């Protein structure tokens, strides 16, 4: 549900950013000032104080044992790869390609790009019903295919508005995969260990968000859009392979 709500907001953001970009390229950056009131409000939130003394040695030992498990490492790699597929070929390369290849204006690019968020919202909103019919493994593999297929032909799409289809599918991949991965990461340990585990997962997210735009920008400069999206396709294949081994098949209950 959280992914669906955030995706609903991000449907509007590219459109607003594109319209502001038509006015001035500096204007979209002023939107970040809206975060300042939120920062002030967060200082007013009262947090509960921990009960008793914290056994840090036991905490780090238990958390370290969880983080060294093969399944935990697989989840962190999967998180990194998913955000690499999002922030590299989609968030970074597509707006540049749309301007260079289709000579599209900022508002048109923003409107087309909003289909990523629409796909993510619809997939995340329908995830509870889908999970009732199919296992997490099946859904994450479907999400992996949705990451991979659009990147296979996005560079060869003849028109800007036709890009809405692969972008929508790419957004659906996010809506299917990220809630499932985040839920499984949170369940790796006990509630006492959850903060450290989620911190490592979030670090993997931020590293991917930082490295992927730079990496795919370099690839697009050297091998143009075909090279960038071929690299994104390879990332999608890696997502499928890691998900195949990390998520265990759902086993039917034994009959007595």
Question: Predicted segment positions?
Answer:
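Helix-loop-helix hairpin linking two adjacent transmembrane segments in secondary transporters
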Residues: 1-44
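A late C-terminal transmembrane helix in Major Facilitator Superfamily
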Residues: 191-223
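Helix-to-loop junctions at the C-terminal end of transmembrane segments
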Residues: 123-135, 220
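Extracytoplasmic gate region of multi-pass secondary transporters
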Residues: 74-113
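C-terminal membrane-cytosol helix-exit motif in multi-pass small-molecule transporters
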Residues: 33-52, 242-247
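Structural signature of the two symmetry-related core transmembrane helices
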Residues: 138-152, 233
């Amino acid at each position: 549900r959280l992914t669906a709500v955030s995706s609903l907001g991000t449907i509007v953001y590219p459109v607003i950013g594109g319209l502001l970009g038509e006015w001035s390229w500096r204007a979209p950056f002023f939107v970040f000032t809206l975060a300042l009131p939120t920062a002030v409000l967060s200082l007013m939130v009262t947090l509960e104080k921990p009960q008793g003394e914290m056994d840090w040695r036991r905490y780090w030992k238990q958390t370290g044992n969880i983080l060294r498990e093969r399944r935990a490492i697989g989840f962190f790699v999967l998180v990194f790869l998913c955000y690499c597929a999002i922030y590299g070929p989609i968030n970074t390369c597509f707006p540049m390609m749309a301007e260079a290849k289709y000579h599209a204006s900022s508002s048109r690019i923003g409107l087309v790009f909003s289909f990523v968020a629409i796909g993510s919202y619809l997939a995340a909103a329908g995830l509870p019903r889908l999970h009732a019919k199919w296992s997490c493994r099946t859904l994450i593999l479907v999400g992996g295919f949705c990451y991979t297929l659009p990147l296979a032909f996005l560079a060869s799409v003849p028109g800007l508005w036709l890009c809405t289809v692969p972008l929508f599918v790419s957004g659906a991949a996010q809506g299917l995969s990220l809630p499932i991965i985040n839920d499984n990461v949170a369940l790796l340990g006990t509630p006492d260990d959850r903060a450290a585990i989620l911190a490592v997962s979030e670090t993997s997210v931020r590293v991917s968000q930082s490295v992927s735009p730079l990496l795919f920008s370099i690839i697009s400069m050297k091998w143009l859009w075909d090279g960038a999206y071929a690299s994104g396709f390879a990332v999608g294949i890696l997502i499928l392979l890691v998900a195949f081994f990390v998520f265990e098949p759902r086993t039917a209950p034994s009959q007595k």
